[in-house]
């Protein structure tokens, strides 16, 4: 802690101006500690130098009770958070303070949340598929180990449930470490996630970091960096880490609030002019090195379902795979409501996933595309007016569409159906058999919410009795 002490001269909501001596202005991103009247320490981060002796800071917590003239101490370093084994099984805020009822974390090892991205020499990305056990993802938009994946969808189509299922599958099937970062989302969901993880036993392999929607914009803007910093430590120790960010849109949204509070002129649709720079600084740190990997899954809220909005559009540039959740699919009762035609992946390539996988995925997409084209004709004339070949395509497409649904472990209490983890070999075999026409006589409804193709046949036998 340095001896550089200033005084608060202005407070406008979460923006705090602090006056220091001319030659002792704190650096940009330094943490400033202000002792409140009730004894609590308010942490602010330096964002701008205003004039010769004033710094403009953003508070990481509420500023109620703060007044002018209070002393502010420059810590001489950015906000630092605990890293290492001590963070597993715990919940933290943006400052690395525990939010659960556990003991204080007195860890010697701390990392600053502002760190440079790994250099080109350190980076390593060998294209390799990451099995999730979710059929529609593994078959049509497979995830890359050490890649960045975007989960796109409007409000209420199932982004958070899909993330929870991924955490569950990764912990149980791969034994990997996960860092979950809740950025500007509902506290209730964080609470539910914590208790579900406690029940399923995956909490011991997970660190949770939250900056929820009731917190000041500074906390929501920086909490993604806190979670990333914890994940970077595990990566540098040679681990394969999963970093979940729910929701990356709130990172952009908080940045736009902070930008407006700092008086910057807004850019397109009211976003901050530095949107691409801020997103790039975060995303470039989420990468795999020669030591270990960070595979990141980022939920992306799409405002008004408009994919051309600057916030989701800026996120697109950084992704290796995108999983698009569709309201029209959710409306017909198929969950996960992943759009098989809009979702894509860079590694759906025969050199990475193999010839058989690539061929089956291509044929599935082709049939679904043809079915989409035929739907207009069906709506006007009915199925009976189609050619026999097209009737067969429609019948198989409907079976494929229903077979892309799957019961989730984390949704068991709502659906009453036991969750299923489906290995990629079983997924490919199931769809290959449907494409070959082996199950043309099986009723369509048997394919809905089944795991493997054997389960479909069991359901069909039960229905026939």
Curated annotation (Swiss-Prot):
Topological category with respect to the lipid bilayer: Peripheral membrane protein
Binding site for ATP: 153-160
CDD domains listed in its UniProt record: ATP-synt_F1_beta_C, ATP-synt_F1_beta_N, F1-ATPase_beta_CD
Pfam family membership, one: ATP-synt_VA_C
Molecular-function GO terms, alphabetical: ATP binding; ATP hydrolysis activity; proton-transporting ATP synthase activity, rotational mechanism
Primary subcellular site in the record, as a coarse category: membrane
SUPFAM superfamilies, A to Z: C-terminal domain of alpha and beta subunits of F1 ATP synthase (SSF47917), N-terminal domain of alpha and beta subunits of F1 ATP synthase (SSF50615), P-loop containing nucleoside triphosphate hydrolases (SSF52540)
Alphabetized UniProt keyword annotations: ATP synthesis, ATP-binding, Cell membrane, CF(1), Hydrogen ion transport, Ion transport, Membrane, Nucleotide-binding, Translocase, Transport
PROSITE patterns recorded: ATPASE_ALPHA_BETA
Protein's UniProt keywords contain Secreted: no
Catalysis performed (reactions): ATP + H2O + 4 H(+)(in) = ADP + phosphate + 5 H(+)(out)
SMART domains in the cross-refs: AAA
Compartment(s) of residence: Cell membrane
UniProt GO cellular component terms: plasma membrane; proton-transporting ATP synthase complex
EC number(s) recorded for this UniProt protein: 7.1.2.2
Origin superkingdom: Bacteria
Coiled-coil spans in chain: none
PANTHER family, A to Z: ATP SYNTHASE, ATP SYNTHASE SUBUNIT BETA, MITOCHONDRIAL
Function: Produces ATP from ADP in the presence of a proton gradient across the membrane. The catalytic sites are hosted primarily by the beta subunits.
Family: Belongs to the ATPase alpha/beta chains family.
UniProt subunit comment: F-type ATPases have 2 components, CF(1) - the catalytic core - and CF(0) - the membrane proton channel. CF(1) has five subunits: alpha(3), beta(3), gamma(1), delta(1), epsilon(1). CF(0) has three main subunits: a(1), b(2) and c(9-12). The alpha and beta chains form an alternating ring which encloses part of the gamma chain. CF(1) is attached to CF(0) by a central stalk formed by the gamma and epsilon chains, while a peripheral stalk is formed by the delta and b chains.
UniProt protein name: ATP synthase subunit beta
Originating organism: Clostridium perfringens (strain 13 / Type A)
